C-alpha cells in the first residue's frame, strides 16, 4: 500500500497567492490506498503518526540476504511537481524498477494521488505529500512533515515549474515574489537548502540533487535565442524582492513584465544554483549536483497557458520539423537516468540527449554558467527566503 501524508489542518492561502491550493498547517502520516488504510485515515490527529513501512524492505533500512550479506536498500527520491508531465513520468519510471520509493511532492494532493493510480504506480512504491512552492511556509512545513515520516532522503529532484508565456502583468506568491521566479527558483532554493541536511545524513552510496533546467534559458542554442532571451542583467530586480510594488517584478529590473522571459530567467537561476551547490558542497559531501534538459516535451501541461494555436501547432512542429519532440514517457526515463544511473554521477553537469537518446554533457551559455553571477543569485536568494 502506498504511504501517503494527508493534511490534518487546512487553511486558505495567504492573500496574494494565485495558486489556489489550500496550505497545510500540520501534516499527519497515514496509509492511504487500501481499505485498511482508509479506515486508519479516519483517526486524524494534529500530531504526526508514524506509518507502518509501506514496502517490504523499508526505504530507511538495509536488508540481509540468506547468505547474511547486506543488500542495498530501496532509495528514496523526492520529486516536486510529480502529479503530471515530466515529474509523473519520472516517478513512474523509478517506481517501476522496484529500487526506488518515490515521494511525490505536489501542490494538489488529490490530483497527485489520482495521477499515480492512473499511471499504474504500484501501492507501496510512492508517497504523496503536500508542497506548495508558492509559499515558503509550505516549503518549511513539507520539510518538517518529511522528517516526521522518518524516511531517508537519497535524491532530491527539483522539477516543478509554472510557465505564463502570454502574461503581461505579474502575479505573486504568498510571500510577495513574482510567481514564476518564486515557484521555479526561490521555492526550490529554500527546499534544497533545508534538505541538504537530510541528503548529507543519507547512507545511500550515490546521493544526488537534480534541478531541471531548460534549453530556453541557454542562449548558446537556437531555442535559447528565440525572443525574449533570458538575461538576469545586474540582478537589481531580484535584489529588490521582485515585488513589483517598489521596484521591478523582473530579475533584471525591467519595468515592463514579460511572462515568457520571467520563466526563462527562472531557469537560468536554476542552472546557476545547481553549479553553486556543486562548488560549495560537492567536494565536502560527495553529493552529485546536476541539471538537465530532457528534450522538448511539446505535449506537456506546462504549455497550458499558451495560446490555443501554439498548443495545436507546436507538437507537430517539434515532431516533423525540428525533430526535437520527446514524449513524456521518454523524458521521464531520461530524468530517471540522472537520478539513478551509475554512469551519470559526475557533479556540476548539465545533461542533454542526442537524437539517438544517448546522454551527453551539454555546454551552458555564459549567462547560465557565470560563477560570480551564481554567487550573487545565491546570496540574494538566501535573503529572500529568510536564510540570511
Curated annotation (Swiss-Prot):
- Name the GO terms of the biological process aspect: chlorophyll biosynthetic process; photosynthesis
Taxonomic path:
Eukaryota, Viridiplantae, Streptophyta, Embryophyta, Tracheophyta
Protein name according to UniProt = Protochlorophyllide reductase A, chloroplastic
**Gene3D superfamilies in the record, alphabetically?**
NAD(P)-binding Rossmann-like Domain
Gene Ontology molecular-function annotations: protochlorophyllide reductase activity
Keyword Plastid applies: yes
- Localization terms from the record: Plastid, Chloroplast
Organism field:
Hordeum vulgare (Barley)
Q: E.C. number, please?
A: 1.3.1.33
Amino acid at each position: 500500500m502506498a504511504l501517503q501524508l494527508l493534511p490534518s489542518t487546512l487553511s486558505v492561502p495567504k492573500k496574494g497567492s494565485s495558486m489556489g491550493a489550500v496550505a497545510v498547517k500540520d501534516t499527519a502520516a497515514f496509509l492511504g490506498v487500501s481499505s485498511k488504510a482508509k479506515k486508519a485515515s479516519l483517526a486524524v490527529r494534529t500530531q504526526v503518526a508514524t506509518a507502518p513501512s509501506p514496502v517490504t524492505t523499508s526505504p530507511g533500512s538495509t536488508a540481509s540476504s540468506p547468505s547474511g550479506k547486506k543488500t542495498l536498500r530501496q532509495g528514496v527520491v523526492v520529486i516536486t511537481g510529480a502529479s503530471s508531465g515530466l515529474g509523473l513520468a519520472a516517478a513512474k519510471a523509478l517506481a517501476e524498477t522496484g529500487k526506488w520509493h518515490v515521494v511525490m511532492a505536489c501542490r494538489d494532493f488529490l490530483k497527485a494521488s489520482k495521477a499515480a493510480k492512473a499511471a499504474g504506480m504500484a501501492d507501496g512504491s510512492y508517497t504523496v505529500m503536500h508542497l506548495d512552492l508558492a509559499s515558503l511556509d509550505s516549503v518549511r512545513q513539507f520539510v518538517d512533515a518529511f522528517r516526521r515520516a522518518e524516511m531517508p532522503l537519497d535524491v532530491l529532484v527539483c522539477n516543478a515549474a509554472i510557465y505564463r508565456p502570454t502574461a503581461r502583468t505579474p502575479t505573486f506568491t504568498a510571500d510577495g515574489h513574482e510567481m514564476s521566479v518564486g515557484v521555479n527558483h526561490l521555492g526550490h532554493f529554500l527546499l534544497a537548502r533545508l534538505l541538504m541536511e537530510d541528503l548529507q545524513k543519507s547512507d545511500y552510496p550515490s546521493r544526488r540533487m537534480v534541478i531541471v533546467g531548460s534549453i530556453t534559458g541557454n542562449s548558446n542554442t537556437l531555442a535559447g535565442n528565440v525572443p525574449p532571451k533570458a538575461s538576469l542583467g545586474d540582478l537589481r530586480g531580484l535584489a529588490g524582492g521582485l515585488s513589483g510594488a517598489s521596484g521591478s517584478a523582473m530579475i533584471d529590473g525591467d519595468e515592463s513584465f514579460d511572462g515568457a522571459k520571467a520563466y526563462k530567467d527562472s531557469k537560468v537561476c536554476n542552472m546557476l544554483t545547481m553549479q553553486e551547490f556543486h562548488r560549495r558542497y560537492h567536494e565536502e559531501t560527495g553529493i552529485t549536483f546536476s541539471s538537465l534538459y530532457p528534450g522538448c516535451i511539446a505535449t506537456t501541461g506546462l504549455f497550458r497557458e499558451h495560446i490555443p494555436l501554439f498548443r495545436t501547432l507546436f507538437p507537430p512542429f517539434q515532431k516533423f520539423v525540428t525533430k526535437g519532440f520527446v514524449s513524456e514517457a521518454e523524458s521521464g526515463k531520461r530524468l530517471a537516468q540522472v537520478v539513478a544511473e551509475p554512469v551519470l554521477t559526475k557533479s556540476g553537469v548539465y545533461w542533454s540527449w542526442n537524437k539517438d537518446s544517448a546522454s551527453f554533457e551539454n555546454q551552458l551559455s555564459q549567462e547560465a554558467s557565470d560563477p560570480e553571477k551564481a554567487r550573487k543569485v545565491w546570496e540574494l536568494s538566501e535573503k529572500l527566503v529568510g536564510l540570511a
